[in-house]
Amino acid sequence: MLSHLADLQDYFGPLRLLRYITVRTLLAAVTSLTIGFVIAPWLIAKFRELKLGHGYIDDRTGALGATYFDKKNTPTMGGLIIFLSVFTSAALWAAPNIWVFVSLFVYAALTIPGWRDDYLKVVHKNRNGISSWEKIGWQSLATVVALGLLLWHPASAQKIREFWVPFVKYPLIPHMHWAVLLVLIYLWIVGFSNAINLTDGLDGLAIGCTIPVALVFGIMAYVADHVFLSQYLLTSHVPGTGELAVICGALIGGCMAFLWYNCHPAEVFMGDTGSLALGGLIGVMAFMIHQPLTLVIVGGVFVAEMLSVVVQVGVFKITKRRSGVGRRFFLMAPVHHHFQKKGWPETKVVLRFWVLSLGCALAGLATLKLR
């Protein structure tokens, strides 16, 4: 929106800087950071006043339950802090185009079921929240509408059909059938939506791991939009996706503001309101800039968390079917709880996972040069 102020540069010269994506990305980060710091104390106080916190300790934590006693009644729905910060900042500083619109649509659409899930848990004391089918329904609807918009708009109709993989300097699939495209984009949006949701189990863990992912994809979005850089690095050129770097800037600022209040001991939890939407936003952006498999590398911590649950459930079912007694591969899943069971303090688990996330992000960024 504010990018159009650059048209007034004849009246005020410095406004010409708004033509540069890098400048608006920085402004988006500062804006979302500021909004987050302004609204977070008020929202946290309001959540406490309304008693919008989990009033129970999850039985699945077992012996870890005592560790979480101090977190009982900590306000949740903190994802609203991130959403208001990121969405407002991105809407202000990103130049409107189909890529921006679809990204913000997916982000908003997946915030709704997350908020509803948290609402049922903290207001109606429904420990299960929304049903799995309702959650899948929302995620499916968001995916179908997003893909429909991308296939309808002339600026994205052809580009979105290309499928690129790391280390290869041409599209592996130049023109995907819409049905194949639907399956793939669904897997990325829903997969990473649920992956971040599973990772959000310790103070600051999920949000801290999201920041390096957003930083790397901001760089990749800028490269994809830049004619010279995309040609030099032999990556896909997707005109207009540079504006996604502005969204990533807003995401970094919003996450940093939230982390200030979510670090141990957390004053607020993001809840499903934040985690489901963040995963969907990152997933759809990765797909639109033709870096879906790179996300598997960059978001390695999230992938590991999700796979740990899949392995745990799979091993338990297989061993129970064969011997009648289910066995577990990990002491507890997701894997961050496994390390807690081994005696690691919560802060050590979180900090080490942050280090791993940064390493994964740098490894994914390095793939730009390897073709």
Curated annotation (Swiss-Prot):
Top-rank lineage group of the source organism: Bacteria
Lipid bilayer topology: Multi-pass membrane protein
EC numbers for this chain: 2.7.8.13
Co-factor(s): Mg(2+)
Disulfide bonds: none
Keywords, alphabetical: Cell cycle, Cell division, Cell inner membrane, Cell membrane, Cell shape, Cell wall biogenesis/degradation, Magnesium, Membrane, Metal-binding, Peptidoglycan synthesis, Transferase, Transmembrane, Transmembrane helix
GO molecular function: metal ion binding; phospho-N-acetylmuramoyl-pentapeptide-transferase activity; UDP-N-acetylmuramoyl-L-alanyl-D-glutamyl-meso-2,6-diaminopimelyl-D-alanyl-D-alanine:undecaprenyl-phosphate transferase activity
Entry keyword Metal-binding: yes
One GO CC term on file: plasma membrane
Residues annotated as transmembrane: 25-45, 77-94, 136-156, 172-192, 204-224, 240-260, 269-289, 296-316, 348-368
One example of a Gene Ontology biological process annotation: peptidoglycan biosynthetic process
Major subcellular location class: membrane
Reactions performed catalytically: UDP-N-acetyl-alpha-D-muramoyl-L-alanyl-gamma-D-glutamyl-meso-2,6-diaminopimeloyl-D-alanyl-D-alanine + di-trans,octa-cis-undecaprenyl phosphate = di-trans,octa-cis-undecaprenyl diphospho-N-acetyl-alpha-D-muramoyl-L-alanyl-D-glutamyl-meso-2,6-diaminopimeloyl-D-alanyl-D-alanine + UMP
Subcellular location: Cell inner membrane
Pathway: Cell wall biogenesis; peptidoglycan biosynthesis
Keyword Cell division: yes
Class of the enzyme per the UniProt entry, highest EC level: transferase
The family this protein is said to belong to: Belongs to the glycosyltransferase 4 family. MraY subfamily.
Biological function: Catalyzes the initial step of the lipid cycle reactions in the biosynthesis of the cell wall peptidoglycan: transfers peptidoglycan precursor phospho-MurNAc-pentapeptide from UDP-MurNAc-pentapeptide onto the lipid carrier undecaprenyl phosphate, yielding undecaprenyl-pyrophosphoryl-MurNAc-pentapeptide, known as lipid I.
Record's protein name: Phospho-N-acetylmuramoyl-pentapeptide-transferase
